[in-house]
From Swiss-Prot:
A Pfam family per the record: CCDC47
Segments forming a coiled coil: 411-467
Disulfide bonds: none
Bias (Basic residues) ranges: 466-480
Basic and acidic residues bias: start-end ranges: 407-465
Region forming the signal peptide: 1-21
Low complexity: compositionally biased ranges: 51-60
Residue segments, region Disordered: 38-72, 116-147, 404-480
Keywords: Coiled coil, Membrane, Signal, Transmembrane, Transmembrane helix
Name the UniProt record assigns to this protein: Uncharacterized protein At5g49945
Length: 480
């Protein structure tokens, strides 16, 4: 009877050991799932133990005590709980699939999910809320590189756009200046125009097919005419805005300037009398008198005469005498351009007029007219101004001073000639003194480099020359 009880207790003990060991050894698949799920539910409350890979099959020297039946029952989870938990969350595969689970006994398997902490390269768990310093520094470096590239691209794009604007403005401005010059030539230098009627030869050469305009620069054009009495010829110079230069164009928007044309008439020496006369705007009268040497020396600002029709109040006259001013400002000129009634319409482009027989330069007897150019569509505004040129060529060529005015002008010119001679003589003396001083300095520097023997010989030679110079010369004569 005792033998039967022994077998019964032995079987009961073995059965109990199998039931208790199955959740830890992973032999039963269904119980493994239950254990995995239970460990997944409890992994937040229990700190994860260190995972070490076993290299031997040695048993643990300190085995854990066997759990009681109550503890085993508390670890079991029903099938309904498993189904409910599997519907709410699906666990992901473990990151250590290459490990053998049989080698880890008595340890809950921690399943890595999307919500589990990140594992870094050194095996430590990283907080997903804490940014990686290396990753953040690389991202910041990439952002800085992209910002620098954008800035460099912006500078390059701006430079390319500026170059394109320069090129476009160059061709457009060049075309505008050429169109303006051709419009002037078509209005005043073509067939049946003012210059064609008053001069026998037009253009830059004597050939029949010679061009009318000479282009010296992108904004400078010249026109030449000759073959008229009282003068050698006429040279017109158009100085236009630098429209081809983008910077000059922008500067002109801030400081406006005008297109100008200057006429230089070279008078014959024998036809032009003693005349120094100028006319300009009142604001520029004093400046013009200071800049022009002949006006500064011979002429002064003339006040308007009483009881006579005169130029508009916006003009000022600079003349050698009142007689010359009265003779050159005729009623025809006042009615056509410079009078109060005509100046607003026909004289708005007038800048200055200068007539002188003492003009500084190669040609002394000259007449200069300076006008502002309108645009190509309004060339009719300066028709009467251009007509003044042939009118004054004839007027000044025929003009003769009275005896009283001539004596006054001759005395002034004689005095000016003496002053000019003195200035020239003083300039020559200064140049000669400067040359002597330089020569003396060079000789002193050369003597400083000589030896004592050379200096002694030179002094002896100089004394002999002085003695020879002091001896009176005797002239030998032969008597017959």
């Amino acid at each position: 009877m005792s033998r039967y009880f022994s077998f019964f207790f032995l079987a009961l003990f073995l059965h109990y050991r199998i039931i208790v060991a199955s959740p830890f050894e992973g032999f039963d698949a269904e119980e493994d799932d239950v254990t995995d799920d239970s460990s997944h539910l409890l992994h937040h409350s229990l700190p994860p133990p260190l995972l070490t890979q076993s290299h031997s099959s040695l048993s643990d020297p300190d085995p854990e005590p066997e759990p009681s039946s109550a503890e085993c029952k508390s670890d079991l989870i029903t099938e309904s709980d498993l189904e409910h938990q599997s519907d709410s969350k699906t666990p992901s595969s473990t990151p250590f699939e290459y490990w053998d689970e049989d080698e880890f006994e008595g340890l809950p398997v921690e399943i890595e999910t999307l919500e589990s902490p990140l594992i870094t390269e050194n095996g430590t768990h990283a907080d997903p809320k804490t940014p990686d310093l290396k990753t953040s520094s690389e991202a910041q470096g990439d952002t800085n590189d992209q910002t620098k590239k954008k800035k460099s691209y912006a500078v390059e794009i701006a430079c390319v756009c500026f170059l394109i604007a320069l090129a476009i403005n160059y061709f457009v401005g060049k075309r505008e200046n050429e169109s303006l010059a051709l419009a002037w030539a078509a209005k005043f230098a073509s067939k049946d125009t003012i210059f064609q009627k008053n001069f026998s030869m037009l253009g830059v050469s004597e050939l029949e097919d010679s061009p009318l305009l000479l282009k010296e620069a992108l904004n400078v054009f010249k026109f030449y005419a000759s073959g008229r009495r009282y003068c050698h010829g006429l040279l017109a110079t158009m100085e236009l805005k630098s429209r081809h230069d983008l910077i000059s164009r922008v500067f002109n928007l801030v400081v406006p300037c005008k297109d100008e044309i200057t006429f230089e008439v070279y008078m014959n020496e024998e036809t032009m009398d003693h005349v120094v006369f100028a006319m300009t705007k009142k604001k520029a009268a004093k400046t013009m008198q200071k800049e022009m040497r002949d006006l500064q020396r011979f002429a002064g600002i003339v006040s308007p005469p009483a009881g006579r029709k005169w130029v508009s109040e916006e003009f000022a006259l600079i003349s050698e005498s009142k007689e010359v001013a009265a003779d050159l400002i005729t009623d025809t000129v006042l009615d056509q351009v410079f009078g109060d009634k005509a100046v607003d319409k026909y004289g708005k482009n007038f800048m200055s007029m200068h007539i002188s027989d003492q003009h500084p330069g190669k040609h002394k007897k000259m007449m200069l007219f300076k006008f502002s150019l309108p645009d190509a569509k309004h060339m009719d505004d300066i028709v009467r101004l251009v007509a003044l040129i042939p009118y004054y060529i004839d007027l000044v060529g025929r003009y003769r001073l009275s005896s009283q005015a001539r004596n006054k002008t001759e005395s002034g010119r004689q005095k000016a000639a003496e002053e000019a001679y003195k200035e020239l003589h003083n300039a020559r003396q200064e140049a000669l003194q400067k040359k002597k001083a330089e020569k003396k300095k060079m000789m002193e520097e050369a003597e400083a480099k000589m030896s004592a023997e050379v200096i002694r010989k030179k002094e002896a030679k100089e004394r002999a020359r002085q003695v020879k110079k002091a001896v009176p010369k005797m002239k030998m004569s032969r008597s017959h």
